[in-house]
């Protein structure tokens, strides 16, 4: 496994891979890897010859009062996990390598970036789209892998690749959860034991709505109200919305296949997001 910090070196290493006509898979991360990231790596290794993992805490996707300075970082741990998982290349650039002096060109996403997280984190998806576009240009993968937990991010990136004619397949991998249902996230480490227990209200609310949907309930207000009852244990519910997975607009009620129930909530000072897809196979 190679650890590369410079774009020029990365391009040289991957030129040899392309010349050998090998398929390149890419997993962009901000580090502090967990089993969710390892599932993305596993998916890449299953379908690609070479897997590149980027580790870069992207400053442009954090707001002024967010957790950039305290976002968890442990490169030695990440390197060991990548080595055990069979990663071919770790790309771990500095902020100066990604955003050199006089940098001023950004990717401005459209309507998909406005609802849900976009309504509460202005500029977030601008930063996400910009860094992912830059990483795509640096790595030039055949396939890139993202987790379903970040459903809106996946939608924004998929739209960007289409709009900018990037020849990259975007694969979404199902959310990986702790045994008790909590969606895996690097930010879970912020939670004290009492907050960790209350954070289960998020997945339990989503699962309760999904169970009711599977039992035949199609009224959006009823499903949202059921999830909201569980979410009374969080400190602040930022949003709980049923949306169309293609447009991220509020889904029509009664629900039509499919819809996504999305939530963002604070437990203590930690902001957590999660979602569940509500769908069925037409008979």
Swiss-Prot record:
Pathway this chain belongs to: Cofactor biosynthesis; (R)-pantothenate biosynthesis; (R)-pantothenate from (R)-pantoate and beta-alanine: step 1/1
Pfam families: Pantoate_ligase
Catalysed transformations (reactions): (R)-pantoate + beta-alanine + ATP = (R)-pantothenate + AMP + diphosphate + H(+)
Catalytic residues identified in the record: 37 (proton donor)
GO biological process, one term: pantothenate biosynthetic process
Location of this chain's protein in the cell: Cytoplasm
Residues reported to bind (R)-pantoate: 61, 153
Annotated residues for binding of ATP: 30-37, 147-150, 176, 184-187
UniProt keywords, alphabetically: ATP-binding, Cytoplasm, Ligase, Nucleotide-binding, Pantothenate biosynthesis
Binding, beta-alanine: 61
Catalytic class of the enzyme: ligase
Keyword rRNA processing among UniProt keywords: no
Other comment: The reaction proceeds by a bi uni uni bi ping pong mechanism.
GO molecular function: ATP binding; pantoate-beta-alanine ligase activity
EC number: 6.3.2.1
Family the UniProt entry places it in: Belongs to the pantothenate synthetase family.
Protein name: Pantothenate synthetase 1
Record's function text: Catalyzes the condensation of pantoate with beta-alanine in an ATP-dependent reaction via a pantoyl-adenylate intermediate.
């Amino acid at each position: 496994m190679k650890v590369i910090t410079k774009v020029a070196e990365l391009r040289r290493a991957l030129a040899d891979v392309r010349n050998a006509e090998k398929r390149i898979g890419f997993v962009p991360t901000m580090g502090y890897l967990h089993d969710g990231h390892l599932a993305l790596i596993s998916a890449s290794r299953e379908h690609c010859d070479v897997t590149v993992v980027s580790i870069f805490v992207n400053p442009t996707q954090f707001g002024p009062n967010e957790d950039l300075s305290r976002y968890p970082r442990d490169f030695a741990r990440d390197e060991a996990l990548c080595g055990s998982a069979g990663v071919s290349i770790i790309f771990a650039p500095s902020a100066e390598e990604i955003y050199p002096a006089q940098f001023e060109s950004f990717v401005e996403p459209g309507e998909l970036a406005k609802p849900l997280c976009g309504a509460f984190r202005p500029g977030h998806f601008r930063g996400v789209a910009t860094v992912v576009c830059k990483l795509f240009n640096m790595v030039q993968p055949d396939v890139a892998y993202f987790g379903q937990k970040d459903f809106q991010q996946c939608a924004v990136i998929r739209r960007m690749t289409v709009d900018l004619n990037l020849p990259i397949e975007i694969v979404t991998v199902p959310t990986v959860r702790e045994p008790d249902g909590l969606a895996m996230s690097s930010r879970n480490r912020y939670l004290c034991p009492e907050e960790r227990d209350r954070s289960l209200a998020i997945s339990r609310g989503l699962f309760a709505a999904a169970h009711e949907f599977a039992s035949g309930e199609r009224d959006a207000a009823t499903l949202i109200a059921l999830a909201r009852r569980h979410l009374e244990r969080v400190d602040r519910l930022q949003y709980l919305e049923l949306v169309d997975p293609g447009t991220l607009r509020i889904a029509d009620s009664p629900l039509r296949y499919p819809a996504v129930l999305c939530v963002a909530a604070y437990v203590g000072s930690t902001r957590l997001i999660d979602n569940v897809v509500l769908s069925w196979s037409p008979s």
